[in-house]
């Protein structure tokens, strides 16, 4: 909408003159920032990490380690296996920490419906990565509406069944995100359909209380064995969202210089690591390491990132990945 209404400046010339670190950070991906073949303008620097390899994943569904332990750490690969583990655990442990056990909880009263209702339906029913409300058939080079795809009806039938059975949180459609996080922090929600960045603070709270078994394992759950989990699928740089400069900006040169500093080694280290001697140090091999104190505090203090600034303002700015 901003581009269609001519609200953003084309940063191409400014980057050519003032953005060497921007070009260095994006490298071979730089040309992918251009809007289209018809309009090669660069309206935004994407918020996706550049050269990011998937090393760890929260899977398509999550399950408490306590439930996995109860099942001899057997991994559920299908919805039926996943549901049965939760069902059996709820029967055996109807309460956790003196509160009613919740089988699966999601929060759909605000934008989180997208990450907990829409996205999992594509992951689990179709083995499709997050492409918005669309499924991309790379072989046929076709795009079609996700919720009309094969498997979607069966996925929502499953949600309906576990709701009627009492496994799905009855407040899933009306509870606030804060309510949802509080339930997770109580340690009584067995399964999630979410991403770890969303419930991370609740896990920090659980660990600080010595309830590591109530944190979550990311699992490759799909609707049946014919569907392949998409969580480890490598994808190209996502350029659909990011940070741009509006035409009302009084000093676009200064704005680009700031973005260029963000992309510099100095800026990237400060945003991601903090201050040398306080949050990190260099070992005898010249490798940057987080201090033991910060490592321990980051595991138990839900305000660590906000308090120290480490990792707090990485998004929505450009950032190096882990490659």
Can you say where each PLM-predicted feature lies in the sequence?
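Extracytoplasmic/secretory soluble proteins
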Residues: 1-323
């Amino acid at each position: 909408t901003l581009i269609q209404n001519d609200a953003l400046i084309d940063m191409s010339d400014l980057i050519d003159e003032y953005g060497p670190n921007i070009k260095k950070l994006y490298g071979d991906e730089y040309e992918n920032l251009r809007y289209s073949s018809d309009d090669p303008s660069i309206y935004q620097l994407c918020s996706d990490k550049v050269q990011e390899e998937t090393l760890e994943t929260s899977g398509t569904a999550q399950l408490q380690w306590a439930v996995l332990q109860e099942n001899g750490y057997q991994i559920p690969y299908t919805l039926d296996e996943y549901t049965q583990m939760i069902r059996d655990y709820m029967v055996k442990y109807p309460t956790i920490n003196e509160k009613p056990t919740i089988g699966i909880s999601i929060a759909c009263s605000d934008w989180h419906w997208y990450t907990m209702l829409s996205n999992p339906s594509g992951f689990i029913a179709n083995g499709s990565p997050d492409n918005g409300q669309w499924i991309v058939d790379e072989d046929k080079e076709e795009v079609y509406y996700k919720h009309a795809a094969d498997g979607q009806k069966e996925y929502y039938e499953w949600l309906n069944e576990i709701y009627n059975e009492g496994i799905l949180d009855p407040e899933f459609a009306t509870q606030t995100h804060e309510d949802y996080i509080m339930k997770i922090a109580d340690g009584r929600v067995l399964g999630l359909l979410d991403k770890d960045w969303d419930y991370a603070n609740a896990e920090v709270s659980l660990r600080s209380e010595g309830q590591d078994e109530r944190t979550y394992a990311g699992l490759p759950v799909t609707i049946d064995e014919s569907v392949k989990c998409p969580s480890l699928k490598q994808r190209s740089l996502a350029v659909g969202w990011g940070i741009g400069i509006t035409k009302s900006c009084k000093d676009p040169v200064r704005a680009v210089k700031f973005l260029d500093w963000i992309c510099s080694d100095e800026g990237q280290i400060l945003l991601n690591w903090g201050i040398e001697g306080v949050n990190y140090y260099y070992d005898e091999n010249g490798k940057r390491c987080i201090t033991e104190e910060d490592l321990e505090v980051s595991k138990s203090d839900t305000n660590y990132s906000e308090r120290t600034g480490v990792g707090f303002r990485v998004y929505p700015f450009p950032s190096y990945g882990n490659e």
